[in-house]
Amino acid sequence: MRLGTTAFAIASATALGLGLTACGAGDPAANSDTTRIGVTVYDMSSFITAGKEGMDAYAKDNNIELIWNSANLDVSTQASQVDSMINQGVDAIIVVPVQADSLAPQVASAKAKGIPLVPVNAALDSKDIAGNVQPDDVAAGAQEMQMMADRLGGKGNIVILQGPLGQSGELDRSKGIEQVLAKYPDIKVLAKDTANWKRDEAVNKMKNWISGFGPQIDGVVAQNDDMGLGALQALKESGRTGVPIVGIDGIEDGLNAVKSGDFIGTSLQNGTVELAAGLAVANRLAKGEPVNKEPVYIMPAITKDNVDVAIEHVVTERQQFLDGLTELINKNLETGDIAYEGIPGQKQP
């Protein structure tokens, strides 16, 4: 997703509480109806940047003040950020965690003080969370691996670019990939390693694999689009074209890669929709309103057949999509399908 000046400022921040407030949210001291919600994310990836736009739009429409933090992939930084938000007395906390097995003391502290803490997009290993808004990453991993298996005709050599090791997205997407690989004994994994969701790290990782395996690499399975795009860059710089690549997330550059044929497909995890849904759940919990506390985001497969509509939502008609986001999110919470946005292949709830 496009990274503007604000996004770069967020990504570079390592201090606690960046204090970015949603436009129009208002001053909580002047308006007692304002809900103050703290947010800490693992990093400002393309996916999270798109998600921030969605959360800001939902916050503006619902009188929510957002206090944004980026942990820059550091567990201790994220723990300090959550501690700070608890001390500030926010009404709810949203966490996109660096690691699944982190933040146990902070989760317990938030619960003890009556502050709903909701992991969104990446899970926390805790029974004390107030809600849980997660994608089905196992299904997404299986979906992308099945795309690759179909393209390879059930045999060939692949490399796998993983997310940060130990993060729930990496663990579950790996599980889904392995489930499909078990059905195809003639597909061999030459190498797999993390590139931490980052495009630049994937470029370097892929160049090393190209040096080591050369033409043996028949396909690249990337656990997100950014890493797939890094692999694509490395392949092109090495003079290799036509190597099938599949990703997950459906960020702008990933969707364009599907349209151009550089990717065989992706799975749309529209951060704008998913993180806004997480905010809606946290907001209702903070207000004591009824809500499904554990909705699941099911990613639709994106191929050349339906990529144009996804591009409209993520890129070319984005403002129109953002303008209708609150209505979409609220309707999706009622139907239970928080991923629905009218992509061809999605079933109307």
From Swiss-Prot:
Induction (UniProt): Highly up-regulated during growth on D-threitol relative to growth on glycerol.
Gene3D superfamilies xref list: 3.40.50.2300
Signal sequence extent: 1-22
Keyword match Transferase: no
PROSITE patterns linked: PROKAR_LIPOPROTEIN
Keywords for this protein: Cell membrane, Lipoprotein, Membrane, Palmitate, Signal, Sugar transport, Transport
Official protein name in the record: D-threitol-binding protein
Protein's organism: Mycolicibacterium smegmatis (strain ATCC 700084 / mc(2)155)
GO MF term list: carbohydrate binding
Entry's Gene Ontology cellular component terms: plasma membrane
Phenotype on disruption: Cells lacking this gene are defective for growth with D-threitol.
Membrane topology according to the record: Lipid-anchor
InterPro entries listed in its UniProt record: Peripla_BP_I, SBP_2_dom
Intracellular or extracellular location(s): Cell membrane
Record's function text: Part of an ABC transporter complex involved in D-threitol import. Binds D-threitol. Functions in the transport for the degradation pathway of D-threitol, that allows M.smegmatis to grow on this compound as the sole carbon source.
Residues that bind D-threitol: Y42, N121, R173, N224, D249, Q269
Protein family according to the UniProt entry: Belongs to the bacterial solute-binding protein 2 family.
Chain residues carrying a lipid of type S-diacylglycerol cysteine: C23
GO biological process: carbohydrate transport; carbohydrate utilization; cellular response to carbohydrate stimulus
Residues lipid-modified (N-palmitoyl cysteine): C23
